[in-house]
């Protein structure tokens, strides 16, 4: 149990730092769409789809790796709270179209990336 807790802790910290770095680098590039948050959510969705595909096929992987990557890293990397706050800020600024676009791209993009990764890595022969 302690190993699992440490895996979530380490993965979560690493994912959070990665999200912060993405936000620092890419959010300033566009006024209305926080590109760093979008990148974090899409990358995290892809990684979790890939992880679920691999872990469902490779049952001999230590559960520590599963929680490190999915619950830890992807949980720290992706962020519904930051995404929600950014949408609220756009709404407060009266940028309703941008807020709606942000919701649309984050949600559908994340679903699409998870499905794509699951499909790609379920079909692969990597063991």
Curated annotation (Swiss-Prot):
InterPro entries named among the record's database cross-references: FluC
Catalytic reactions on record: fluoride(in) = fluoride(out)
Pfam families tied to this protein: CRCB
Record's keyword terms, sorted: Cell inner membrane, Cell membrane, Ion channel, Ion transport, Membrane, Metal-binding, Sodium, Transmembrane, Transmembrane helix, Transport
Compartments where found: Cell inner membrane
Transmembrane annotation, as ranges: 4-24, 35-55, 71-91, 103-123
Membrane topology: Multi-pass membrane protein
Activity regulation details: Na(+) is not transported, but it plays an essential structural role and its presence is essential for fluoride channel function.
GO MF, any single term: metal ion binding
Residue positions binding Na(+): 75, 78
GO terms of biological process kind: cellular detoxification of fluoride
One Gene Ontology cellular component annotation held by this UniProt entry: plasma membrane
Function noted in UniProt: Fluoride-specific ion channel. Important for reducing fluoride concentration in the cell, thus reducing its toxicity.
Family membership: Belongs to the fluoride channel Fluc/FEX (TC 1.A.43) family.
NCBIfam families hit by this protein: crcB (TIGR00494), PRK14196.1 (NF010792)
Protein name: Fluoride-specific ion channel FluC
Organism: Shigella flexneri
Gene (UniProt): fluC
